[in-house]
Swiss-Prot record:
Organism: Oceanobacillus iheyensis (strain DSM 14371 / CIP 107618 / JCM 11309 / KCTC 3954 / HTE831)
Residue sites binding (6S)-5,6,7,8-tetrahydrofolate per the record: S108, L109, L110, P111
Root EC class: transferase
EC numbers: 2.1.2.9
Protein function: Attaches a formyl group to the free amino group of methionyl-tRNA(fMet). The formyl group appears to play a dual role in the initiator identity of N-formylmethionyl-tRNA by promoting its recognition by IF2 and preventing the misappropriation of this tRNA by the elongation apparatus.
Family: Belongs to the Fmt family.
Molecular functions (GO terms): methionyl-tRNA formyltransferase activity
Signal peptide residue numbers: none
Gene that encodes the chain: fmt
Keywords: Protein biosynthesis, Transferase
Alphabetical list of PROSITE patterns matching this protein: GART (PS00373)
InterPro entries: Fmt, Formyl_trans_C, Formyl_trans_C_sf, Formyl_transf_N, Formyl_transf_N_sf, Formyl_transferase-like_C_sf, GART_AS, Met-tRNA-FMT_C
Gene Ontology terms: cellular component: cytosol
Protein's name according to its UniProt entry: Methionyl-tRNA formyltransferase
Amino acid sequence: MKRIVFMGTPDFAVPVLQKLLELKYDIVLVVTQPDRPKGRKKVITPPPVKEEAIKHDLDIFQPEKLRDDYKKITDLKPDLIVTAAYGQILPKEILEIPTFGCINVHASLLPELRGGAPIHYAIMQGKEVTGVTIMYMAEKLDAGDILTQVEVPIEQDDHVGTMHDKLSLAGANLLSETLPSLFNNEITPKKQDESLVTFASNITREQERIDWSKTANEIINQIRGLHPWPVAFTTYEGKVMKIWWGQELSKSSKSGNIGEIIEKDTDGFYVQCGNNTVVKVSEIQPAGKKRMLVEDYLKGSQDRIKIGIKLGE
């Protein structure tokens, strides 16, 4: 049985590790990021991959900087290194260790959406299809030759959370189909077309801010593409209000200035957007409060949401 070093950190990588274990591959080492402070109380918390590895009594390695600390991997002489959302770029010295190379499970159809937030960008850009790519690792980010790919449709009610789970499982299944062919030298790697490269760099605070001058469709894609993390936001009377969910309306009986609340009902409020479009907001997180339905928020007082207020100011 081939000796595999697995490298991954967040929830996305867990099904990939589980699949390798299910298929009885010899996981000689799990490399993951160091434990980090988490939550408001900054409790030191192990990454999900470490928690999964502990369940299976696997050897775990958590270097702060892999580039400076990889002798343990070299000494193991693995046949293959499999990575999935590990969080550090592998240096050339590591790429050259395994007989069958280093392969990565990436949540996009490369060469589109290289980088750390491909699921967010796929939804924010309004794509109807994304997918998973398994490719060789290269010194340049997500630029290695492609081994296999699978498409995964994005439904209208999908968001980052649902697509994260779909793509994670799709990646695990694709890996299980890819490895036998890889080990039997039955795959011809395909170079990425550099003219088609796009990037999905980590989400910035400004990308989380809703620009109400955009169309309702663009804003809903932004909300879906930032749900459930890091979450789109606006301001209401100068205070941050996170927008967890809403819907695009084909038309409204009323209109107003861009960003203005033009109407409300029992379960939402309506915001004027660009190109004479309207978004109905149905789930929010007001400043200093928990996430809640607008319906529940308004039960406290109808005055909590006022018609005529302009969001984003």
